[in-house]
């Protein structure tokens, strides 16, 4: 294996962060969150990957605002009530010297159609061919709010 991938198990520096190897786990939806909160099942899932030697884990979809949800089992991080679960998850992964980062996400027109959800938003009022109804074009003001939500 080293003949073809001589640097795979070597550390790599990304900005100011050093990752122990070049084995990265991409975001893969598990739908194991409970109303956006990290569950014990999620902690076990990600810590098992860290224990197996992954250098960097990118979590699954993590919503940054409360109105639109991609799938009901997705994780969230739009207010401080989510911090204890995230801390438990991060601590579990860090015990194996694995780095972890959240895939911050807003579903826009792909949001799950939960009753009471307002009309879906998108960059324009043209949605995908499979959508039951067209989204509403996001306003400049809403875009500023979304940018702030990603930053918080």
Residue locations for each model-derived region?
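Flavin-dependent oxidoreductase catalytic cores
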Residues: 1-152
């Amino acid at each position: 294996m080293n003949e073809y991938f001589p640097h795979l198990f070597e550390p790599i520096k990304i900005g100011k962060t050093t990752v122990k190897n070049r084995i990265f786990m991409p975001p893969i939806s598990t739908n194991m969150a409970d109303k956006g909160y990290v569950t014990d099942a999620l902690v076990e899932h990600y810590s098992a990957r860290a224990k197996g030697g992954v250098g960097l884990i990118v979590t699954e979809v993590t919503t940054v605002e409360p109105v639109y949800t991609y799938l009901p089992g997705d994780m969230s991080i739009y207010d401080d009530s989510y911090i204890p679960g995230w801390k438990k998850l991060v601590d579990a992964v860090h015990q194996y010297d694995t780095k972890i980062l959240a895939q911050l996400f807003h579903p826009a027109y792909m949001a799950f159609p939960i009753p009471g959800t307002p009309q879906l938003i998108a960059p324009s009022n043209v949605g995908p061919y499979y959508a039951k109804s067209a989204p509403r074009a996001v306003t400049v003001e809403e875009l500023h709010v979304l940018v702030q939500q990603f930053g918080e």
